[in-house]
Amino acid sequence: MHAYARNISTTAADTTVLEDVRANFGDFSDKTLSSYKSALERLFVIEDVPAWCPAIRSRTAIRSTRKKEFTDPSIAVAALGASPQRLLADLQTFGFIFETLCIRDLRAYTSAIGGKLSYYRDRYGLESDCVLHLPDGRFALIEFKLGNRQIEEGAAHLVQIRELIHEANASKPGVRIEEPSLMMVVTGGSLAYTRKDGVHVVPIGCLKQ
């Protein structure tokens, strides 16, 4: 649990988790790790997020590893033994915990309408922390940014992905990719607004079913 929590909201390979476990607890086989993961999934303790692989880059450029997530961020915090003071002193870890919180809320709020979550990341550093898919084919590109200073970066990523979709549709007219119905940066702030580029900035407290 501790090793998994150390890699929360990342695409770290299972071998990375295994090395972490072995460093702290000695001999531990990959078969044992796999059985532990299966048990935690059945108990709804962990629920990894699959990758979204649209035809906007070559398949080798788009990451396909599942992103590691707990069903609730409090489990990760408990596994890490992290206090509020420790999280405030380690904003990178706090950011990953915040991402898990957002994923949990979006899963809860959209499950009734058949919403499914994935993520996008390529080898060039372009990413969308979450892609929300609806049964009718519509989807939203979403970034999670704990601090207001990161909003610009998150919005830029979403706009770039939208532009890649435009370019892919223009170059392959016979294979059209739907464009995002919504681009949103979820923040830990208190102000909600829409930017000139069409990206909505939404505090996590404003999310609802």
Task: State where each predicted segment sits.
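Switch/connector loops and helix/strand junctions flanking conserved nucleotide-binding motifs
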Residues: 78, 151-153, 192-196
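Short, well-ordered amphipathic alpha-helices
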Residues: 18, 155-169
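Basic, glycine-rich polyanion-binding accessory segments appended to enzymes
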Residues: 123, 153-154
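Accessory nucleic acid-recognition modules appended to NTPase machines
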Residues: 1-138
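Structural motif
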Residues: 138-140, 182
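Active-site ExK catalytic segment of metal-dependent nucleases
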Residues: 140-149, 157
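Domain-level recognition of nuclease-like catalytic cores that cleave nucleotide substrates
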Residues: 181-209
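Short mixed-charge
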Residues: 163-182
